[in-house]
């Protein structure tokens, strides 16, 4: 087993820690209306961990048009990263429409980026450009739309800012790794890119679910403060 496969298995083991944090969070929220809503956080470390086990054995790694794509990596990202950004919106108290919007933007960024991996020439860079547009729209949700609706509750503001900046900083790194790797300008090796992605994925997902556990007091109230737009709807209905 080579260094990359070993790193993949190491990443899978590290993600078990994330599963433990979600389990502890779920147990600590017994009786809270947020308990069931936060349960899908488990998908993040579980799906990513299983994907890494598959990647370690080259499952889903294929050649398309002469270009290698680690299929399970993109399937993992397509499943888990929309959940990551969606729960940032949930922590902000954003509307369901906004949460779905940021999740769709993230999913399209990943899907179009995968298309850029298996194409060449002008089409590759056109797809990279489209993926970058979805990337920028995702940042608009994180840094413009969501901050407008966070209730004036210090604990909730603190959790939102922590999640927002954690995801925001890491989401800047991923396209740079892609750009310098074999799929982009080819300045980094496939092995180097693979090892970097393992590091980024574990760093993105395990601390993320830990933050929810560490700041679980936010979700222990009978109900969280409504977002401004929700409050407006409720006030209008009452009138």
UniProtKB/Swiss-Prot annotation:
GO terms for molecular function: monoatomic ion channel activity; photoreceptor activity. The chain crosses the membrane at residues 4-25, 35-56, 71-92, 96-118, 123-150, 154-181, 190-222. Residues 1-3, 57-70, 119-122, 182-189 are extracellular. Pfam families: Bac_rhodopsin (PF01036). One of its GO terms (cellular component) is plasma membrane. It is a multi-pass membrane protein. It is found in: Cell membrane. SUPFAM superfamilies: Family A G protein-coupled receptor-like. Residues 26-34, 93-95, 151-153, 223-239 are cytoplasmic. The modification N6-(retinylidene)lysine is found at residue 205. Gene3D superfamilies: Rhodopsin 7-helix transmembrane proteins. Keywords: Cell membrane, Chromophore, Membrane, Photoreceptor protein, Receptor, Retinal protein, Sensory transduction, Transmembrane, Transmembrane helix. GO terms for biological process: phototransduction. SMART domains: Bac_rhodopsin (SM01021). Belongs to the archaeal/bacterial/fungal opsin family. Interacts with HTR-I. Involved in the control of phototaxis. Mediates both photoattractant (in the orange light) and photophobic (in the near UV light) responses. The signal is then transmitted to the sensory rhodopsin I transducer (HTR-I). This is Sensory rhodopsin-1. It comes from Halobacterium salinarum (strain ATCC 29341 / DSM 671 / R1).
């Amino acid at each position: 087993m080579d260094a990359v496969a070993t790193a993949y298995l190491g990443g899978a083991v590290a993600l078990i820690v994330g599963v433990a944090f979600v389990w502890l969070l779920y147990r600590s929220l017994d009786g809270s209306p947020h308990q069931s809503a936060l349960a899908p956080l488990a998908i993040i470390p579980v799906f990513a961990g299983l994907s890494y086990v598959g990647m370690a054995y080259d499952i889903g790694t294929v050649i398309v048009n002469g270009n290698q794509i680690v299929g399970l990596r993109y399937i993992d990202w397509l499943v888990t990263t929309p959940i990551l950004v969606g729960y940032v919106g949930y922590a902000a108290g954003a509307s369901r429409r906004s949460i779905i919007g940021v999740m769709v933007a993230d999913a399209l960024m990943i899907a179009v980026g995968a298309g850029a991996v298996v194409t060449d020439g002008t089409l590759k860079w056109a797809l990279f450009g489209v993926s970058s547009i979805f990337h920028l729209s995702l940042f608009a949700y994180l840094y413009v739309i969501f901050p407008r609706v966070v209730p004036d509750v210090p604990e909730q503001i603190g959790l939102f800012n922590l999640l927002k900046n954690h995801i925001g900083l890491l989401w800047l790194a991923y396209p740079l790794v892609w750009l310098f790797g074999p799929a982009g300008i080819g300045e980094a090796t496939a092995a180097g890119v693979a090892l970097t992605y393992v590091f980024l994925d574990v760093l993105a997902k395990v601390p993320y679910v830990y933050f929810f556990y560490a700041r679980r007091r936010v979700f222990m109230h009978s109900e969280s403060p409504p977002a401004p737009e929700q409050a407006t709807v409720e006030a209008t209905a009452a009138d």
